[in-house]
Amino acid sequence: MGYYKQKKPIKKKTKTEYIMFVDETDPTATGDYFCLSGIIIKRSDYENDLVDKINNLKKTHFGSCDIVLHYTEMKNNRNNFKILKDAVKRNKFYMDFVNILKPLDITIISSYFNRNNMKATYGKCAVSDYDVAFKTLLENFVHFLKNNNGDGMIIMESRLFNENANLQNTFYQYLNNGSELFQSSIIKYRLKCLGFIVKNDNCIGLQLADFVPATIIRIIKGAQDKFSIQKT
């Protein structure tokens, strides 16, 4: 009489949820360069830790957590950030800001290129700067999710409706058709959704992402980083 020992079912590892917040450079501020960047963070870290810390930072330095952090306005001490004209207050804010960012378990991916070189190389065949960079971010985000056993969501700042529609089209084409690196089934298993949030909705993730592209361009150009944001 034979003996059969039933094997224990193999438990699948639970996937971790990640959010990638995406923002781009202001074309008038970076000259020939275009940069699209994404900040990747665990959903649990974002919702349970980071949001509260940034809101407390805003309340401490600007008196309200409803203020939307904006890199260009802060750099030029405009509107809600005129208080940063005071060197002491400015230094204290950025020191506190950097101290929040340093311990974060985040990953940053960026795609940048010289617009003029792109046009010179591809001429009339060149597609939009945003579309080229977005496809690169998609590939790298899926690679990250695959390596970290994650599910991913992308959140972007809403632009014109037709521009949002173009990005949605690129996103779903990528999901359905796959790429040279990943089959469609792998992409769909990892990449779950794309969302758009309007600028004044006070999304903490997008406010942090707003600092990244300009910082990347500063690194490329070798510009000074007085508050060591590049090192965080």
PLM feature spans:
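Phosphate-ester processing/binding pockets and catalytic centers
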Residues: 1-232
